[in-house]
Amino acid sequence: EGVNMSYRTNRHSCYDLEYHLVVVTKYRHPVIDGAFKDRLTELTYRIFEENFQCYVNEINTDKDHIHILFEAPPQMTLSSLVCSYKTVTARLLRKEFAEYLAPFYWKPYLWSRSYFVCTVSERSHELITEYIRNQRNKEKG
């Protein structure tokens, strides 16, 4: 039997590691919107794909959190990725959107200290993708 074509490979491994990450804003302030949301999305792709060699399958936001569905190589450490992601996005976004964020945060905050992450199986992939895509729709409906 051949290798499943959905597997990714690198020099030393063949793998299929997919994760669903949710990061929440500090105090759940509703800051993820408009140009801020666009820049956050752009930074998310860049950090995950360029800095950590991950593949982003889906991103969606609500005003106080972001969902990221991504595949990662086995050598990637989840805690390092999340820490780096939160640190880099907070630093850049607080600098670029200082005036916009001023009414929400007096101290240099953006993200809550905690986060949610889970593995995604082949069976749950479609379900989680659909859930992430529908995040914005639930607040409108």
What are these regions (language model features)?
Residues 1-141:
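Basic nucleic-acid-binding interfaces
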